[in-house]
């Protein structure tokens, strides 16, 4: 077990180095895969040109646009946190079929897109959205500020992989070490009594990796919500990107950077 934890930490450290390098425009994995793909690309380009001479179609090669790394990536480029959490939450909303649903800060091109296939949804985000999307109503709002928020208006609220960013300045929000606490209070305020909250956050050894995110101990989320919310289900994604649904919080393995998926009902 200790060896697995050490491997997990090393793996996470390497991913962090990769992420930081990518922030500065350098993607070492993409570079290696692209260089690896050059000989095959040249061979296939020549092969295609020769075969195209005898083709019945009228397509001609107008320019070269190399895609060198796609064949090597498989599903390794998929962020398992977002992939599983978006499916998990969309299925919950579909099953619960609330009269109205509002989302705070989740990905438009993931979870919100899933929801829009079967219902209308309202979205709050501190960032602006320029696109007009049928079925989606957008309002710019800072969830650390309570004065502009509707109170007890929604049957269902979601906030996926967003709460951990509140107050760290990453998305243009103000610096506030208690931003996650204020944000969680706002989520609870939005809910009607007996309304459902779907929440996902990074879980593991509690810490801040400034200004990327917080990582929460599961007990912290439980403590912050226990007076206003009842937890009705808990699922998680472990360090290996494996999804475990409807688990007991008493049986959570040690993780460095997992994802906790919480389903609550407002008291």
Q: Where is each model-derived feature located?
A:
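A short glycine-rich, Lys/Arg-flanked "PGG" loop and its adjoining helix->strand segment in the class I
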Residues: 175-196
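A conserved beta-strand element that flanks and buttresses the S-adenosyl-L-methionine
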Residues: 158-163
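Membrane-proximal basic amphipathic "stem/tether" segments
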Residues: 1-65
């Amino acid at each position: 077990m200790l060896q697995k934890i050490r491997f997990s930490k090393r793996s996470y450290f390497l991913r962090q180095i990769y992420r930081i390098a990518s922030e500065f425009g350098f993607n070492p994995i993409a570079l290696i895969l692209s260089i690896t793909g050059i000989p095959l690309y040249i061979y296939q380009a020549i092969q295609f040109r020769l075969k195209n001479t005898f083709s019945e179609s009228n397509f001609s090669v107008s320019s070269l646009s190399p895609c060198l790394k796609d064949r090597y990536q498989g599903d390794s480029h998929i962020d398992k946190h977002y992939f599983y959490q978006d499916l998990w939450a969309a299925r919950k909303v579909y099953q619960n079929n609330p009269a109205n649903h509002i989302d705070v800060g989740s990905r438009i091109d993931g979870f919100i897109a899933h929801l829009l296939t079967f219902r209308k949804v309202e979205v709050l985000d501190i960032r602006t959205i320029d696109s007009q999307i049928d079925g989606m109503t957008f309002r710019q709002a800072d969830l650390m500020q309570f004065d502009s928020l509707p109170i007890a208006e929604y049957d269902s609220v979601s906030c996926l992989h967003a709460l951990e960013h509140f107050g760290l300045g990453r998305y243009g929000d103000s610096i506030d070490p208690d931003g996650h606490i204020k944000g969680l209070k706002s989520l609870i305020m939005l809910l009607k009594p007996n309304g459902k909250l779907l929440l996902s956050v990074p879980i593991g050894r509690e810490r801040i990796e400034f200004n990327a995110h917080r990582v929460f101990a599961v007990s912290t989320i439980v403590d912050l919500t226990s007076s206003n919310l009842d937890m009705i289900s808990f699922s998680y994604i472990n360090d290996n990107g494996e999804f475990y649904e409807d688990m007991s919080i008493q049986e959570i393995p040690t993780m460095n950077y997992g994802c906790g998926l919480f389903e609550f009902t407002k008291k």
